[in-house]
Each structure stands twice: as structure tokens, then as C-alpha cells.
Amino acid sequence: MGLLSEFKAFAVKGNVVDMAVGIIIGAAFGKIVSSFVGDVIMPPIGLLIGGVDFSDLAITLKAAEGDVPAVVLAYGKFIQTILDFVIVAFAIFMGVKAINRLKREEAVAPSEPPVPSAEETLLTEIRDLLKAQQNKS
């Protein structure tokens, strides 16, 4: 089997395709969460603490000189990134929790006993007939 056909067999497997779809959806979800945090959550928080825009919060370590830009610690962006992470982690936690609950419900659901095969049914009837004959004698 050639390298190309091996790769094709690997790439077409369900798990690889599912993983790729998950990564793409995860990246899109990350962008949505970043927008949610930056555009919806942080402005009211900034307003509550005095009209501060968190993305602008920074400590200047060295001022700009000529063409050399300033060296800054942009801790406001870091706070937003931490909030992004917390929201994504919480969403993943809730998703995993829901999946685990569904798995537990499936495991707890009583399964019907297997229907005996025709051979087992016949053997059971023969056993019962032999016991009945033994009890008569």
C-alpha cells in the first residue's frame, strides 16, 4: 500500500474527520467568546469601575523613542484573555458534564434480558419434562 493511499485511509476515518470538524468549530467558538467578552462583558465592567476600557490598561516600562515603540505590559488585554479562557472552560465543562450525565442514564437504564434461543427453550422444556417424570415415579 502506497503512502498516499495509507494517508487517504487514515484521513477518511470517522475519528479524524470528527476531530477536524471539532477543531474548526472550536476556533469559531473561540472568536465568538472573544467578541462576547470584549464587546459585551468588559464595557459594562469598565463602566462600573469608572469608565475604564480594559483593552487600554497597560503599564509603560519604557517610553517610545523616535522610531522605537514603547515597551508596555498590556495587562488589560491579559485580563480579557483570562476571562475568555474562563468562559470557554466553563462551556466545555458544562458540555462534558451533560455528556457524562447522558452516558450514566444509558448505563443505568435496565436492559431487557436476552431472549433465549430456540435451542435453549427446547432444552428447558426437556429439563422440565424430565423433572416432571422423575416426580411421578
Swiss-Prot record:
It is a multi-pass membrane protein. The chain crosses the membrane at residues 9-29, 79-99. GO terms for cellular component: plasma membrane. GO terms for molecular function: mechanosensitive monoatomic ion channel activity. It is found in: Cell inner membrane. Gene3D superfamilies: Large-conductance mechanosensitive channel, MscL, domain 1. Pfam families: MscL. InterPro entries: Mechanosensitive_channel_CS, MS_channel, MSC/AndL, MscL_channel. Its main location: membrane. Keywords: Cell inner membrane, Cell membrane, Ion channel, Ion transport, Membrane, Transmembrane, Transmembrane helix, Transport. Channel that opens in response to stretch forces in the membrane lipid bilayer. May participate in the regulation of osmotic pressure changes within the cell. Homopentamer. Belongs to the MscL family. This is Large-conductance mechanosensitive channel.
